């Protein structure tokens, strides 16, 4: 159907259904072919053809065009080789030889279609070039343009030399039966690359002009070549024309290709085969390499080429021995990814400005003899930087030591990021003369050895200063066991060991630092007595002495343990405000000002585009400033500095903290100039919002909290969507007189749904559902016969029967799907893993991918947790064998720590775009997946966990029903029935990943529960833990079922009938359009509208299928049948 999508709805997977569907597509395809035979070009399109007439063959002659079934010629005014090149390429005769004018081309007849044609040479067709207009000219047929092209079959190329090697020598081309040369004017490495590739001789090593590889004789065929290096033949490059030149044979060009170069590499005068002076063999003669611009990237290519993969140092004139003979290469500049040294940029072979005292060398390693560690700092993640290279130990010199260098060291050791760098004065007693000198790290390297220009050896470190670093992993905190992010038992990791903290060792200041480091806002409360459950294992006895201003717990000093006993019953817990820091700035008091957020470590003003009185009131309450009195527009308290954050809060006004409000930041539009959120609070700490009088369904109000009010209040009217998987899709529920109730679907339509979406700040409605599409509600049915005009700001402002007046049951509950409804998935062609694949988001009715730019491990962790896959994962480039996705929706997603969903993470604005090398799609692999094996159902079996690339089991020590509850919930099963021990479903294989698990039952995943460290177990597989859960809850459990095969066939048959009717109507309408004249613009618009309507219907069907509710929809239809 002309490339337009047709989406089949129906969950039936029966063979009968599939046969119906296949038959349907066959019928549609045959009908389409029959219809196409009767269809001409669409209005506004001109059928155009090109040919050469009157020539010796199909690739020479007079240029003729066919327009509106009329053949005509082209005038030769301004006719050049650019135009000829386009004509030849278009006709599949890629080599242009001559541009013929009236003197060489026979005269045509009829129309003269084009004049003053001007091509760049890159057009795909002649009619894409500029010209005076169709049929406009001032020529006669005596000036008809012509061309002579070649299909390349009569052209040959060779390299000529005395040794007879086909891959080096003077370049010669055979044209019109005669061999001739190529002039060296403007000749470059790109030209040489085309020649070597064309001859199958590998890459181009060098080229030379001035007939250095011998002068030829006969014609000089080509001059002033312009190649980009991608051409398949030299004559495909632009040039002056065959035989046109201003050279003689003293300028003949020659080329040496890889297969003719006789190249080799070696290291000499070193302590091993992987170190020494670098020598290169070229054309049978060994020579050296000059050390001009010689650095570690160049050395890394040499080491890799010689099979010694790690470059330790690039040796220059100080340490390398002197060679003799030729100096072959100078000014080498490698990127580091090249496979051979001669692929790097360099001066011409043998051209240099050096002496042998500047010969370059390298020291390489196979990696096994390199070690870097931190010593003397209290853990493996803090201390003096010590290195061991090829069994020689030394220290890192602090001369030139930067935070970027320290960052790389911390990352290499698995210790997070660098918090602090120091230099320790080294005692001369036992001084070492072996030092590692920092080079220039950019901070993105994975190991220190990848940094540029670091040096190793017996150089002097002035003042004996040793480099010292404290990494964030020195004392890394986490919160465990809380019901929401940013709350839980405080656990601290020293090196590789996690332990809890006693409640008398953590002050309010230290708790503030913990919340700040975890990007969880500010501390709300400190709870003792193992409030979130007792930990296991280590209890740290040190007291954290923080000032409260530190960014990381590792920067706080600690007091030695006191002589007092602590057990896990006194484990301390912390509740943070759950969200980023928030403050008021620029006001005359602490209770008014510009709203500023601290996100991703940076303060910036909040955009006011979605800031309202409900949000402002919650902030005032949080800051103990009473209630919100007003939210001034514009930059009332100044624009502020830093990035303007576009977070959108969705507070109801009843929350205690701004972090308790629903919030979205993903895809938020860029904030307009001067749109800065502000608030003026009452300042009365004891003042709270009082309930307003009840609203009638027809009463109008612009907000549940008026913007200006002497006595601020909060109305009872609230709205939510339930059961749709997000805040912008689901069953419509209204809060009235202290309870939530539903809305009846009588007369429910898109206008009503639009009011709901607008009220919830969810965009526009894309579907208005009825018949309890999102499941039946409970309690009151508050509204019925809702009739909106579309201008209302609240659903209860629309006309209705009145509060609680209805003649419905809950099976008629109304629902809505809004354009801001979002869903997340990982998709791959195999469909075997829902925790591995391309990351896609559903937005505005369409699935699209998410870019991987700036995607951090924190962001990947949010994705994996949101999908119920794992706590962490990895992001990789899309595998090359994967099919392209739909357009990309959003890129540059950056999640701070502590967020629940990807929707809360800042990113680029929503915009459909295509993936590119600088903005690639995300392929995510989530870690720590969990499954049940050998059970009788999907919800029973042996518990197995995916960790570090393999599946393993769980030991049954301390295994109980609370542990089973967590696993059942994590797998989406029903209630836990049994926690089974002693390999009840048979022994597993592989590692035993977890032991001594002690869940409370309310954790979101098994790895949130206290347990021994990973793989620390004294169990065998005969002790593998298992569980039994109730089956997964599906809508089938709430409805009767009919005969599945018959139902499926009826559904598929109905769908097929609808498809055929739509297609026949479309075909008839298209034929009507074809009968109209080409100039009828009105009919063109009708044609376009039909296409848009079909696309819109296809998109609607895609939406239902993709939004996660299609299964319920189909089941309900099957039940009704």
Swiss-Prot record:
Task: Show where the record puts the motif Internalization signal.
Answer: 1091-1094
Q: How is it modified after translation?
A: A soluble form (sCD163) is produced by proteolytic shedding which can be induced by lipopolysaccharide, phorbol ester and Fc region of immunoglobulin gamma. This cleavage is dependent on protein kinase C and tyrosine kinases and can be blocked by protease inhibitors. The shedding is inhibited by the tissue inhibitor of metalloproteinase TIMP3, and thus probably induced by membrane-bound metalloproteinases ADAMs.
Q: Which residues lie on this side of the membrane: Extracellular?
A: 39-1045
| Bilayer topology | Single-pass type I membrane protein
The record places the following residue ranges in the Cytoplasmic compartment, namely 1067-1121
Entry's PROSITE patterns?
SRCR_1 (PS00420), SRCR_2 (PS50287)
Biological process terms in GO annotation: acute-phase response
The UniProt comment on domains reads: The SRCR domain 3 mediates calcium-sensitive interaction with hemoglobin/haptoglobin complexes.
What superkingdom heads the lineage? Eukaryota
Instruction: Write down the species.
Output: Mus musculus (Mouse)
Residue ranges spanning the membrane: these are 1046-1066
Instruction: Write out the tissue specificity statement of the associated record.
Output: Expressed in monocytes and mature macrophages such as Kupffer cells in the liver, red pulp macrophages in the spleen and mesenteric lymph nodes.
- Signal peptide bounds: 1-38
Glycan-modified residues: 104, 138
Q: What is this protein called?
A: Scavenger receptor cysteine-rich type 1 protein M130
């Amino acid at each position: 159907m002309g490339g337009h999508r047709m989406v089949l709805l129906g969950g039936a997977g029966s063979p009968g259904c599939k046969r119906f569907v296949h038959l349907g597509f066959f019928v549609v395809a045959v009908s389409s072919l029959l219809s196409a035979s009767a269809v001409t070009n669409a209005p506004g399109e001109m059928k155009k053809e090109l040919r050469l007439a009157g020539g010796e063959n199909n690739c020479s002659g007079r240029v003729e065009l066919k327009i509106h079934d009329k053949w005509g010629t082209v005038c030769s005014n301004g006719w050049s080789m650019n135009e000829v090149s386009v004509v030849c390429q278009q006709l599949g005769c890629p080599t242009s030889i001559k541009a013929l004018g009236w003197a060489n081309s026979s005269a045509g007849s009829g129309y003269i279609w084009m004049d003053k044609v001007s091509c760049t040479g890159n057009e795909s067709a002649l009619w894409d070039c500029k010209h005076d207009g169709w049929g406009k000219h001032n020529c006669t047929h005596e000036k008809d343009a012509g061309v002579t092209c070649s299909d390349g079959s009569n052209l040959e190329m060779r390299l000529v030399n005395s040794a007879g090697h086909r891959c080096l020598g003077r370049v010669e081309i055979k044209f019109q039966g005669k061999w001739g040369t190529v002039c060296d004017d403007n000749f470059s490495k790109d030209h040489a690359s085309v020649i070597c590739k064309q001859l199958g001789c590998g890459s181009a090593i060098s080229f030379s002009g001035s007939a250095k590889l011998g002068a030829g004789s006969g014609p000089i065929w080509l001059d002033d070549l312009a190649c980009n290096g991608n051409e398949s033949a030299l004559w495909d490059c632009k040039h002056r024309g065959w035989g046109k030149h201003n050279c003689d044979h003293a300028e003949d060009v020659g080329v040496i290709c890889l297969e003719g170069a006789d190249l080799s590499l070696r290291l000499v005068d070193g302590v091993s085969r992987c170190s020494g002076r670098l020598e290169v063999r070229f054309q049978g003669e060994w020579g050296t390499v000059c050390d001009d611009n010689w650095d570690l990237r160049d050395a890394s290519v040499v080491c890799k080429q010689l099979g010694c993969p790690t470059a330790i140092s690039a040796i220059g004139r100080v340490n390398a021995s002197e060679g003799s003979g030729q100096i072959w290469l100078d000014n080498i500049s490698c990127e580091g990814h090249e496979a051979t040294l001669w692929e790097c940029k360099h001066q011409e072979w043998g051209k240099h400005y050096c002496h042998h005292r500047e010969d370059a060398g390298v020291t390489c390693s196979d990696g096994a003899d390199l070690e870097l560690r931190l010593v003397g700092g209290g853990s493996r993640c803090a201390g003096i930087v010590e290195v061991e290279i090829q069994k020689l130990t030394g220290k890192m010199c602090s001369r030139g030591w930067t935070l970027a260098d320290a960052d790389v060291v911390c990352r290499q050791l698995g210790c997070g990021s660098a918090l602090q760098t120091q230099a320790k004065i080294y005692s001369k007693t036992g001084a070492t003369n072996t030092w590692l000198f920092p080079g220039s790290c950019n901070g993105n390297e994975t190991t220190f050895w990848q940094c540029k220009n670091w040096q190793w050896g017996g150089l002097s470190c002035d003042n004996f200063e040793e480099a010292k670093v404290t990494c964030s992993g020195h004392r890394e905190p986490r919160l465990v066991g809380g019901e929401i992010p940013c709350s839980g038992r405080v656990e601290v990791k020293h090196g590789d060991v996690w332990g809890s903290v006693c409640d008398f060792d953590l002050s309010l200041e230290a708790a503030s630092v913990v919340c700040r480091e975890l990007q969880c806002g500010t501390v709300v409360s400190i709870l003792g007595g193992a409030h979130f459950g007792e930990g296991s294992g280590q209890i740290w006895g040190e007291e954290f002495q923080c000032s409260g201003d530190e960014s990381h717990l590792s920067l706080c000093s600690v007091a030695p343990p006191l002589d007092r006993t602590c057990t896990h019953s006194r484990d301390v817990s912390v509740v943070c405000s759950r969200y980023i820091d928030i403050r008021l700035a620029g006001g005359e008091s602490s209770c008014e000002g510009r709203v500023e957020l601290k996100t991703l470590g940076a303060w910036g003003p909040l955009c006011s585009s979605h800031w309202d009185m409900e949000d402002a009131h919650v902030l005032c309450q949080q800051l103990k400033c009473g209630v919100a009195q007003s939210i001034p527009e514009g930059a009332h308290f100044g624009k502020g500095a830093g990035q303007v954050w576009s977070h959108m809060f969705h507070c109801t006004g009843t929350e205690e903290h701004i972090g308790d409000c629903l919030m979205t930041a993903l895809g938020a539009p860029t904030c307009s100039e001067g749109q800065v959120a502000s608030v003026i609070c009452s300042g009365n700490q004891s003042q709270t919002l009082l309930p307003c009088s009840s609203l009638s369904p027809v009463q109008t109000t612009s907000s549940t909290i008026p913007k200006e009010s002497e006595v601020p209040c909060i109305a009872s009217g609230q709205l939510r969507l339930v059961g749709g998987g997000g805040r912008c899709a689901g069953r419509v529920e209204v809060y009235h007189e202290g309870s939530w109730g539903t809305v009846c679907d009588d007369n429910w339509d898109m206008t009503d749904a639009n009011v709901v979406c607008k009220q919830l700040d969810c965009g526009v409605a894309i579907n208005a559902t009825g018949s309890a599409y999102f499941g039946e509600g409970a309690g009151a049915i508050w509204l019925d016969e809702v009739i909106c005009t579309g201008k209302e700001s609240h659903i209860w402002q629309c006309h209705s029967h009145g509060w609680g007046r209805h003649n419905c049951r809950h099976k008629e509950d109304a629902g809505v799907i809004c354009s801001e409804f979002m869903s997340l998935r990982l998709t791959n062609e195999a469909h075997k893993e829902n925790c591995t694949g391309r990351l896609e988001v559903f937005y505005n009715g369409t699935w699209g991918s998410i870019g991987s730019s700036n995607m951090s491990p924190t962001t990947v962790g949010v994705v994996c947790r949101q999908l119920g896959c794992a706590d962490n994962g990895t992001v990789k480039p899309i595998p090359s064998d994967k099919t392209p996705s739909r357009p990309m929706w959003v890129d540059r997603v950056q999640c701070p720590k502590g967020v629940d969903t990807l929707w809360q993470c800042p990113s680029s604005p929503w915009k459909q775009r295509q993936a590119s090398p600088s903005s690639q799609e995300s392929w995510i692999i989530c870690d720590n997946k969990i499954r049940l094996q050998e059970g009788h159902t999907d919800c029973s079996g042996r518990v197995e966990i995916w960790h570090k690339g393999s599946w393993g089991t769980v030991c049954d020590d301390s295994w109980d029903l609370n542990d089973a509850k967590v696993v059942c919930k994590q797998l989406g099963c029903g209630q836990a029935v049994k926690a089974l021990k002693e390999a009840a479903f048979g022994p597993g294989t592989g590692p035993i990943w977890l032991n001594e698990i002690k869940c409370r039952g309310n954790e979101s995943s098994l790895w949130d529960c206290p347990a021994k460290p990973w793989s620390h177990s004294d169990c065998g597989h005969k002790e593998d833990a298992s569980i039994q859960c109730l089956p997964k809850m599906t809508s089938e459990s709430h409805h009767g079922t009919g005969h599945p095969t018959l139902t499926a066939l009826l559904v598929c048959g109905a769908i097929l009938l609808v498809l055929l009717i739509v297609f026949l109507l479309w075909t008839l309408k298209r034929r009507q359009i074809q009968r109209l004249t080409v100039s009828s613009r009105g009919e063109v618009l009708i044609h376009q509208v039909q296409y848009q309507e079909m696309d819109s219907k296809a998109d609607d069907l895609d939406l239902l299928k993709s939004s996660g509710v299609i299964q319920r929809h189909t089941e309900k239809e099957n039940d009704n049948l």
